[in-house]
Curated annotation (Swiss-Prot):
Lipid-attached positions, S-geranylgeranyl cysteine: 203-204
A Pfam family of this chain: Ras
Gene transcribed to yield this protein: rabL
Keyword Transport: no
Predominant localisation class: membrane
Species assigned in the record: Dictyostelium discoideum
Motif mapping: Effector region: 36-44
A single GO BP: phagosome-lysosome fusion
SMART domains in the record: RAB (SM00175), RAS (SM00173), RHO (SM00174)
Protein name per Swiss-Prot or TrEMBL: Ras-related protein RabL
Stated family: Belongs to the small GTPase superfamily. Rab family.
InterPro entries: P-loop_NTPase, Small_GTP-bd, Small_GTPase
C-alpha cells in the first residue's frame, strides 16, 4: 500500500529585517544569499522530508515584508501546525515585539500552540546592547508559565554560517506533525460543529 504523505504548514513570524527570509532561503537552497533585495509579499516553499519515520510535505510560509503593513488575515494563519517566531538577538525592538507576534498567534488560534523561538544573526558578536541569554530564558519561562505552550524550543541561528538552520526546521517539523496528529485524532472522536464551537488547537 502506498504511504500517505502529510502536508504540514509552518508560518514564520517576526519583525522586518531580522533575517527570516535568509533562514528560509538557506533551508531551501543550502546557501546564504548576499545582497538580497527586500522581500515584498508572502512566499512559501514545499519541502519533502521524513519526520518520525513518516514522509511529510513541509509547507513553510515567509511573510516577506508583509509585517511592515500588518497585512495579515485569518486565512494566512488558517491550518497552521507550527510557527517559527524570529527576532534579531542584537535588536531590542524585535525582541520586545515578540509579545505582539504572540498576540497575533493567540488571536487566530486555540489551544496549546506549537512554535519555535528563533534568535537570528548569531554570527555577530554580542555586545552590551544585545539581548542577553538570561532575558531570553526568562521570556521562554514566562510563556510556559502562562500555559501557552508546555516547552519553548529556542535556537540561536546564523544563515550566514549555517548555524542551527536545519536543526530548527527539523524541530518545527516534528512539533507540526505532533500537532497535526492531535488535531486529526480529535476530529475523528469529536463531531464537527460550527467553526466557533470547535477549538481543537489549530488555526481557524
Amino acid at each position: 500500500m502506498k504511504e500517505e504523505k502529510t502536508m504540514l504548514k509552518i508560518i514564520t513570524l517576526g519583525d522586518s529585517n531580522v533575517g527570516k527570509t535568509s533562514l528560509f532561503y538557506h533551508y531551501v537552497n543550502g546557501e546564504y544569499r548576499y545582497n538580497r533585495p527586500p522581500s515584498i509579499g508572502p512566499d512559501y516553499f514545499i519541502k519533502e522530508l521524513k519526520v518520525e519515520n513518516k514522509h511529510v510535505f513541509l509547507m513553510v510560509w515567509d511573510t516577506c515584508g508583509q509585517e511592515r503593513f500588518q497585512a495579515f488575515s485569518p486565512p494566512y494563519f488558517r491550518g497552521a501546525n507550527c510557527y517559527t517566531l524570529c527576532f534579531d538577538i542584537h535588536n531590542e525592538e524585535s525582541f520586545i515585539n515578540l509579545g505582539k507576534w504572540m498576540d497575533e498567534i493567540i488571536k487566530y488560534c486555540y489551544g496549546n500552540i506549537p512554535f519555535v523561538l528563533v534568535g537570528t544573526k548569531s554570527d555577530i558578536p554580542r555586545t552590551d546592547k544585545s539581548i542577553s541569554k538570561a532575558r531570553i530564558e526568562q521570556w521562554c519561562k514566562n510563556i510556559e508559565d502562562q500555559g501557552i505552550i508546555d516547552k519553548v524550543h529556542y535556537f540561536e541561528t546564523s544563515a550566514k554560517l549555517s548555524q542551527n538552520v536545519t536543526e530548527l526546521y527539523n524541530v518545527a517539523a516534528k512539533l507540526a506533525l505532533e500537532h497535526y496528529s492531535i488535531v486529526k485524532y480529535i476530529s475523528i472522536i469529536r463531531p464537527i460543529g460550527p467553526p466557533e464551537e470547535v477549538k481543537v488547537g489549530t488555526c481557524c
